[in-house]
């Protein structure tokens, strides 16, 4: 089994970006979606990117953003990859001259082969849980058996992953990459996720689980 790549999404602080990089993350995600508790400004994102070591991919996440908003971010932040998490059409996704991935929320009637055909120019499909009214970061898993083994695009598995279940997810789905956000965050006093503040120890355990399971191939 090829060792899956790991993206730590929803980075809001320099120290969390460094914790991800130092733990072996292949990519970090920066959220440019105002309603998200993990949203960052272009200035914050630029500072986070400037702190990263070489060869860590920076991913900018947008949800039905305007062209002007996306171009404004690209003018200020050294983004390697775009992630479209809304209802963006393939022509729009293609128009920024950057590699991009398209998120697919797993409603009951989703046909991933159909999405792969429509978004054929994507660098991959990010397959996420569906929760009505929540475009991402749901903390919920979905039935991993719904992911076909024969998709023509690389699969980025997301949705409710955490250190305790990611090894099983990798074994079953055998994705090209995995994406985690809330599953590696600190807990607040109520026991819920902090909404952007990462737990460096959880990041290390998560990445080790992915890399070990990928190498073992079991």
Swiss-Prot record:
Molecular function terms, GO-annotated: phosphoribosylanthranilate isomerase activity
InterPro entries to which the protein is assigned, alphabetical: Aldolase_TIM (IPR013785), PRAI_dom (IPR001240), RibuloseP-bd_barrel (IPR011060), TrpF_fam (IPR044643)
Class of the enzyme per the UniProt entry, highest EC level: isomerase
Catalytic activity as recorded in UniProt: N-(5-phospho-beta-D-ribosyl)anthranilate = 1-(2-carboxyphenylamino)-1-deoxy-D-ribulose 5-phosphate
Taxonomy, superkingdom: Bacteria
Functional pathway: Amino-acid biosynthesis; L-tryptophan biosynthesis; L-tryptophan from chorismate: step 3/5
CDD domains in UniProt: PRAI
Biological process terms in GO annotation: L-tryptophan biosynthetic process
Keywords for this protein: Amino-acid biosynthesis, Aromatic amino acid biosynthesis, Isomerase, Tryptophan biosynthesis
Record-linked Pfam families: PRAI
EC number: 5.3.1.24
Signal peptide as annotated in the record: none
HAMAP family: PRAI
Family: Belongs to the TrpF family.
Protein name (record): N-(5'-phosphoribosyl)anthranilate isomerase
Annotated organism of origin: Alcanivorax borkumensis (strain ATCC 700651 / DSM 11573 / NCIMB 13689 / SK2)
UniProt lineage: Bacteria, Pseudomonadati, Pseudomonadota, Gammaproteobacteria, Oceanospirillales
